[in-house]
Amino acid sequence: MAEKRGRVTIPTDLDVIRETLDIMKEWGADAIRDCDGTEFPQELKDTGSKIYATYYTTRKDNDWAKAHPEEIQQMYIMTSIHTAVEESLEIHLMDHLYPDMLAVNTRDDIRKWWEVMDRTTGQPVPCEKWSYHEETGNVRIQAVPFHQYTVSFLAYIMWDPVHMYNAVVNDWKDVEPQMTFDVRQPATREYSLKRLRRFLETHEYVDVVRFTTFFHQFTLIFDEMAREKYVDWYGYSASVSPYILEQFEKEAGYPFRPEYIIDQGYMNNTYRIPSKEFRDFQAFQRREVALLAKEMVDIVHEYGKEAMMFMGDHWIGMEPFMDEFAQIGLDAVVGSVGNGATLRLFSDIKHVKYTEGRFLPYFFPDTFHEGGDPVKEAKVNWVTARRAILRSPIQRIGYGGYLKLAIQFPDFVDYIKEVCQEFRTLYDNIQGVTPYCVKKVAVLNCWGKMRAWGNHMVHHGLYYKQNYSYFGIIEALSGSPFDVSFISFEDIKADPALLKNFDVVINVGDADTAQSGGEYWIDETVSTAVREFVYNGGGFIGVGEPGAHQWQGKFFQLDDILGVEEERGFNLNTDKYNWDEHRDHFILKDCDGEVDFGEGKKNIFALPDTEILIQKDKEVQMAVNTFGKGRGVYISGLPYSFENSRVLYRAVLWSASAEEELNCWYSTNYNVEVHAYVKNGKYCVVNNTYEPQDTTVFRGDGSSFDLHMEANEIKWYEIG
């Protein structure tokens, strides 16, 4: 069979023209792009390939930023907490912040846009009781001894955080920090639209404008040693300015307070249950960002080019699963692929013509150096993401960075050639078809579809000890044969019958976080809707501290469904006798030994009629319970692994009372998975490991056959 070409984007630069042509041929690439820190060679204009041009809406024009310092982008910063030991307290604003990145904004009215908080009382300090001294950079407070205080203030972003990150990682020398200007403000808005037109007129050879992005950077702050200090990939605190906030006040109908963003210092991160004011601000930002983004996209279309958005960096307000996004008219979205869940962040996007995954490793020296192993990183990245692609296909793949680094690793070049060929085959077999889904699953949390697939993410695709046991559920779902939706508590309050659309509901997270739900569980509309859903035959899987909030004599509000409760000292007087395990349960049939619960949970005990599957030292790790016609499953934590993915798969089937549906498009070996595309008349069997595997494969009609597979292998079959 002749090798195919296409659906692959590669980076280039001025010093790798011949090498770019070689790699294009080797990998079958049909698109070339520039990257941050590289330039597109004019010699490659006429290769016949699609040409992407990275376009920065908010930076790479320091002359404009310097001439209009009042329209440089800003962010809200809160100082650390300081304890007053006398009646006067001074707080230095820029402590532990990188001085070249931020500059305190004293241009606008600090009495209106700053806030000094008494963190002991939770109240703002009256303006007449504090003052700012520019010569020292300190705020002086008339304090109450032994109360604690913080200062929330606006700062200009003098060095774009992403440009700074790239400069630090790559050790760029003598590079002028790129300032971040605010495209939303009047003069810069007018200038930016003209600037875009100038770019299009001088880059007639460009086919795709790759916007990076529209228009506000996620929260990323560096400390005085240029180390990452604070990051929130969903953070809104760098999308502010007095100009924007005054517009918000007019729309919202109430005065803005810095605390609506600062949120006691938590900055409304993904784990915080969002306040009404913060939701209002997000909705306002989404509408305004979408309107301006549409203007830019329309201009690109006017010049006969495609508009692509990079999902990251300055992307706040562009949440792609919200209604505003559909009105923008983008042709494509490209996203960085860290794992299966990060791929689903953009592969599930509607209202675009195509999506593209930028795979790892990025061609930067942190991976491509003597002793580095880019092949290993590429294998892990591809095999992990492939599970998700098989459930929700993307249309293109690509790579970024310095091509001159990648070509120094011939084994890497050879492996990516295999990946490109495999992807094209995969695309041909599954594109345009919904894969077989055994059940409809809803993940319930405070964010719903707004943060679908990213609701346990702090920084893009990175591991955190405190959440990997929960994120494992999301990663497993990203490549499992379920029709997965993300719903919020507000969705249920608006329409309790919504739950009838699903077979199983999953709630995963720690108590009183946005993931678990906190006080939403004492809202009778929510709790009764979930109980009714399960009682009438639905399934409920709770992981960690699901439905947990101390109320009316219990912590687990759905203890009647899950059959477990958490001992917090209030039930020590009550003896517990149910500790027998039932490890022969349907859910555990494929487990070879001990189940990995990750960090697990302490002090979980079972109610008298609950069936415990696993307990350790009289702490329940997994249990099942029947409630009416429905079933509940409790799991203390479930990090991602192939075995745990199978545990979750069986838990979904059991909770939905669908054990008999197990042997349908199924592999007996949990390291191997089966995906069926009935409309296309095809199915595939995929080995997710780096070793050969043997399995028995069940087809959709229940018939089966034995199969030996090589490492990472994927086999395609016809149905029928």
Task: State the predicted function of each range.
Residues 2-59, 63-100:
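Noncatalytic N-terminal accessory/assembly modules of large enzymes
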Residues 6-12, 29-35, 100, 170-190, ...:
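The substrate-binding groove and active-site-proximal loops of carbohydrate-active enzymes
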Residues 9, 15-50, 195-212, 325, ...:
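Catalytic domains of carbohydrate-active enzymes, especially glycoside hydrolases
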Residues 44, 62-68, 196-197, 207-214, ...:
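Hydrophobic targeting/anchoring helices
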Residues 220-223, 404-437, 478, 557-572, ...:
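Extracellular ligand-binding/catalytic regions of CAZymes and related secreted enzymes
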